[in-house]
A protein has these predicted regions:
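Short, structured motif recognition centered on aromatic/hydrophobic residues
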Residues: 3-5, 10-14, 58-62
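Short, ordered beta-strand-loop transition motifs
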Residues: 4-7, 44-57, 86-87
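Surface loops and adjacent helix of pleckstrin homology
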Residues: 15-17, 24-25, 63-65, 72, ...
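Extended Gly/Ser/Thr-rich low-complexity repeat segments
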Residues: 20-33, 68-86
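A low-complexity, Ser/Thr/Gly/Pro-enriched, surface-exposed linker/loop concept
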Residues: 26-47
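Ser/Thr- (and often Asn-) enriched beta-sheet segments in non-cytosolic proteins
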Residues: 40-42, 50, 59-61, 92-94
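Mid-chain, well-packed structural core segment of small domains
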Residues: 48-81
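C-terminal charged interaction modules
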Residues: 78-107
Length: 107
């Protein structure tokens, strides 16, 4: 899973295998060991979009129905997009399935 942060924007990209695992009920995790403070993002499928935090972990839930609908229209350049209201203001959340999934292009 690839994570990209910008001000008020979070973009997640997963490969085909990760997308299949997420839809099957697995939790996708990415972590970073900052000096003195580790950070972890867990992505799961659920009933509705929501974000929860606990210590160093952020858990992001995406609606299973939206993930299933996205699967029917792959390959698709546009993924899922949500606006999540946070205490600091709205967050633009984007979820995409990597169409190339690590394959190299011929030169």
């Amino acid at each position: 899973m690839k994570v990209q942060f910008e001000t008020r924007r979070l973009r997640l990209r997963v490969g085909n295998a990760e997308f299949a695992a997420l839809r099957a009920g697995d939790t996708l995790v990415v972590s970073l060991d900052w000096p003195g403070r580790p950070w972890r993002l867990a992505l799961i499928a659920g009933d509705s979009v929501r974000i929860a935090t606990s210590g160093e972990e952020v858990t992001l839930v995406l609606p299973r129905t939206d993930l299933d609908a996205l699967a029917t229209r792959l390959p698709a350049r546009d993924g899922l997009r949500y606006t999540v209201e946070l205490p600091s203001g709205p967050l633009d959340l984007r979820f995409e399935v990597d169409l190339h999934d690590g394959r190299t292009r011929p030169r």
